[in-house]
């Protein structure tokens, strides 16, 4: 397809309607390859234990509040000439650390006693809070004007450099390490939201979609020329992959409806394929780097420096593979934000206020959709449980099972492989048992509940006397990581698609934005509560009680969701909003203000 074939006229200054190129897609995939390693290798494995270990190196034993914890860290033996790297890895998986068990340590932060494991959990909670506020606040500026790519590259640069900076953080500066972790996680989350905002545009201007759209338009030209004379709305250009049909004097024309449905089908198919490729490429890169990190940790004798070196490698990977994205990904500017009453361009505070007001409007409308509210409440708890269990498990394995960093890294590899398997197997299981999406999600919740319940078995005296079961031995972490991965694969596959069935047609962008905010903002609470429980009892195991409750709470909420009722309510709200001529918006959780008549006239004339 030629560059100018099927080219839509620009709808605003700077509008880039060129067909999506292979190089542009490669740039989009490149950033997924670059940044996914942070959430998998850093947040999922090495960052929590690095923060805990640096705090431990400056802490004292909980038992006497005097003995330095640094003295309790015994590095594994040096590699002997006759011991291969693979043998060392096997020993790490089998035996954990050389020191049986692990001593609980505390550190004093501004005079407050904090368990070293809690220190890592508190850091994660703060980073999620900052990330959620930043994502909402920047959404207006990111979706309007030329800021999208600039923000993406800026966050990638700051996040990768913050991760690499761990190499210079010595234990006595462990608070600086926490600051770097907060900055890195915040930048990662913000950059991925920006990356995902490119997806609708890559799909909309993809050559295959343009060809299909033109062919459908030609076929319907004899019956109705509405589609051919209707351009994309200015406020709709960065939006939802799903769009409502064109309306003519309040009535959806037959050809417009047919074209819109066909166009939507093509977009959904293409967006699913591109998104799946991006996720797959990101996870392949993460697994490869995770294995490299494990080998680096083993070859450098699993010291605190080993952990800092691994984080440097992760940050370097993030930085280097962002370069192709910087070179190949087009800016794809969004429409200017033209809602200021005085007609002037919005200032930065104006963009921020617009973003929060837009989110508020969507939340208010959500109150009228009972089933969406039930699902989002359930998803809020589920998402919090998923993130909290991951961090808690790694820190529990380190501080109470005494597992070495290499073994902790392998736990994550096993969980990821199980997640990939789960993403495919749950679909087969659902078809085999004729399960609806909601029933599959409920099955995942029940299976997920087994993880904290298994940890609670360690409180039963008879099981505790056995010396195994109930998470008393390092090897028990690996079967549980398989269960966790299977659950993750199922929930990630089904929750988003199930939520899509409840959304008012034509308002997907606003409600999926609310879904994403619920996902990203939920993890503020779980890690903080685990940290408080750990500080109170001096160990992590009692926090399994909280995790069991947190994972169980979504179950009754999900059982209350009525899909048929939710669809009816969504259609009713959509019809009401269409009647009032309100259009869905590109900003995070936005349903934008109406344009004035002069703006509408400009669009129609173009």
UniProtKB/Swiss-Prot annotation:
Instruction: Cite the entry's keywords alphabetically.
Output: Amino-acid transport, Autophagy, Glycoprotein, Membrane, Transmembrane, Transmembrane helix, Transport, Vacuole
In this protein, the residues bearing a glycan are 229, 236, 249, 596
> What processes does the entry annotate via GO biological process terms?
amino acid transmembrane export from vacuole; autophagy
How does the record classify its membrane topology? Multi-pass membrane protein
Which Gene Ontology terms of cellular component type are present? vacuolar membrane
Has the keyword Transport been applied to this entry? yes
**Entry's localization field:** Vacuole membrane
Any one Pfam family here would be ATG22
Positions of transmembrane segments: 31-51, 116-136, 150-170, 175-195, 278-298, 309-329, 372-392, 406-426, 441-461, 478-500, 512-534, 543-563
Question: Its function?
Answer: Vacuolar effluxer which mediate the efflux of amino acids resulting from autophagic degradation. The release of autophagic amino acids allows the maintenance of protein synthesis and viability during nitrogen starvation.
The entry assigns this protein to a family as follows: Belongs to the ATG22 family.
Q: What name is this protein filed under?
A: Autophagy-related protein 22-1
Q: Which organism is this entry from?
A: Aspergillus oryzae (strain ATCC 42149 / RIB 40)
The primary gene name is atg22-1
């Amino acid at each position: 397809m030629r560059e100018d074939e099927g080219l839509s006229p620009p709808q605003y200054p700077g509008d880039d309607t060129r067909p999506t190129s292979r190089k542009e897609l490669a740039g989009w995939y490149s950033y997924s390859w670059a940044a996914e390693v942070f959430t998998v290798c850093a947040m999922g494995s090495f960052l929590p234990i690095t923060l805990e270990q640096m705090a431990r190196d400056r802490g004292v034993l909980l038992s006497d509040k005097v003995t330095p914890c640094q003295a309790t860290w015994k590095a594994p033996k040096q590699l002997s000439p006759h011991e291969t790297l693979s043998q060392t890895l096997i020993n790490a998986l089998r035996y954990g650390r050389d020191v049986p068990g692990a001593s609980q340590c505390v550190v004093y932060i501004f005079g407050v006693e904090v368990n070293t494991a809690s220190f890592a959990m508190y850091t994660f909670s703060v980073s999620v809070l900052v990330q959620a506020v930043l994502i909402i606040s920047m959404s207006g500026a990111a979706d309007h004007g030329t800021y999208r790519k600039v923000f993406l590259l800026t966050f990638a640069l700051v996040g990768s450099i913050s991760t690499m900076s761990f190499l210079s953080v010595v234990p006595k500066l462990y608070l600086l390490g926490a600051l770097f972790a907060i900055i890195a996680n915040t930048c990662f989350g913000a950059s991925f939201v920006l990356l995902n905002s490119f997806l609708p545009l890559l799909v909309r201007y993809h050559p295959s979609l343009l060809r299909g759209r033109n062919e459908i338009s030609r076929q319907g030209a004899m019956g109705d020329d509405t589609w051919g004379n209707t351009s994309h709305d200015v406020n709709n250009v960065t939006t939802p992959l799903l769009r409502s049909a064109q309306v003519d004097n309040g009535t959806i024309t037959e050809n417009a409806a047919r074209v819109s449905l066909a166009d939507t089908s093509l977009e959904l198919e293409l967006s699913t394929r591109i998104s799946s490729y991006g996720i797959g490429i990101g996870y392949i890169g993460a697994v490869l780097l995770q294995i490299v990190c494990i080998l680096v940790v083993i070859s450098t004798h699993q010291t605190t420096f080993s952990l800092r070196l691994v984080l440097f490698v992760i940050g370097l990977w993030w930085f280097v593979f962002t370069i192709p994205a910087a070179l190949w990904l087009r800016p794809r500017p969004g429409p200017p934000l033209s809602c200021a009453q005085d007609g002037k361009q919005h200032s930065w505070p104006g963009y921020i206020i617009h973003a929060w007001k837009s989110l508020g409007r969507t939340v208010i409308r959500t109150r009228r959709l009972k089933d969406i509210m039930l699902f989002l409440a359930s998803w809020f708890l589920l998402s919090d449980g998923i993130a909290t269990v991951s961090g808690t498990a790694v820190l529990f394995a380190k501080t109470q099972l005494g597992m070495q960093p290499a073994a902790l890294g392998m736990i994550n590899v096993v969980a990821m492989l199980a997640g990939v398997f789960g993403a495919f197997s749950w679909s087969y299981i659902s078809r085999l048992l004729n399960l609806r999406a909601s029933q599959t999600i409920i099955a995942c919740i029940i299976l997920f509940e087994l993880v904290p319940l298994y940890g609670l078995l360690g409180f039963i005296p008879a099981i505790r006397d056995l010396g195994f079961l109930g998470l008393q031995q390092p090897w028990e972490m690996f079967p549980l990581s398989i269960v966790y991965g299977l659950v993750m694969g199922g929930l990630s596959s089904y929750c988003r698609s199930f939520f899509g069935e409840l959304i008012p047609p034509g308002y997907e962008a606003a409600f999926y934005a609310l879904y994403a905010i619920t996902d990203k903002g939920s993890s503020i609470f779980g890690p903080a509560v685990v940290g408080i429980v750990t500080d109170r009892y001096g160990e992590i195991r009692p926090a399994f009680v909280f995790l069991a409750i947190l994972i169980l709470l979504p179950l009754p909420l999900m059982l209350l969701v009525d899909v048929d009722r939710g669809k009816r309510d969504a259609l009713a709200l959509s019809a009401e909003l269409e009647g009032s001529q309100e259009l869905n918006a590109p900003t995070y959780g936005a349903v934008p203000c109406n344009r004035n008549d002069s703006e509408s006239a400009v669009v129609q004339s173009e």
